Amino acid sequence: MTPSEPDSVKTRSILTNLSRLAVYDTGIPNRAAASSEVLVLWPSVLADHRIYDAQVADLREHHRLILIDGPGHGASGPSSGRFSMEQCADALSQVLDTLQIVKPVVVIGTSWGGLVAGEFALKHPGRTRAVVMLNTPVFKTRARWRDSFVSWGARWLKFTNRYVQGVADAYFMPETRKRESAFMEGFRKHIRGVSGAALSRAVRSVLLEREDLASRLNSIAAPTLFVAGTHDSMYPVDDLRHAAAQLTRGRFIELPTAHLSVVDAPSETTQAIDSFLTELQLTSSFSSPGAKA
């Protein structure tokens, strides 16, 4: 975690089917109650667990948070080859096994992480309390030049300002980029600091070779919050709204953000997640197929 976070956060390297994954565990909160959940958070490609810093600060008081850096990202090791989102879901399950977490969990994911969350809910329904899919590209689209460039650039151009700035332009609102915060500096350093080969392998697996999830969303049994950004130039909000309508126990929320809502609108995103967690205690709120907020 970031240097400012308490020492109570435990960092582990856990062997999975993909690689050794860096896992950050806030532990059981002092104010744990019957409503406390275990939240598992997986970030987007080209970013690590620090995109959730704002959410961790607010949610850890009442919930146990498990944050996972995907293969080739952050402090995690490289995968041995390309991988599927289902394999990522299996890796998440193996992390829970190692941590001896048996109660159903709330899986929260941004983009790549949202795909993992959806696959986890489909393959491991008994372990899934609920799902939060943030800015998640559920459609299997034809390979676009931009996606191919991002994948290739992750291997060969990641040290250049042009590549890193291009990623930032796609991910964040102009106001976020102009802040020049510690987060933005860390975001750039992360891209430049990890292995280009490992990063490119992961980016290709997610952007170019992911499976279609939109056609299977109606098979997710768990309550699901789907958040999309109005200004997401990568994945149009109307397309994601249409896909989310297939969720049988779904909530759709649109926020005035680009691709990473957790960074562009941290307070609003955290509030949406917190409200969703509160509603989990009232399961009748999700009894109607395709419920919307």
Task: Describe each PLM feature range.
Residues 109, 113, 117:
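Gly/Ala-rich beta-loop-alpha elbow adjacent to hydrolase catalytic centers
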Residues 220, 226-228:
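Short beta-strand/loop motif that positions the catalytic acidic residue
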Residues 57, 66-108:
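Active-site loop/oxyanion-hole signature of alpha/beta-hydrolase fold enzymes
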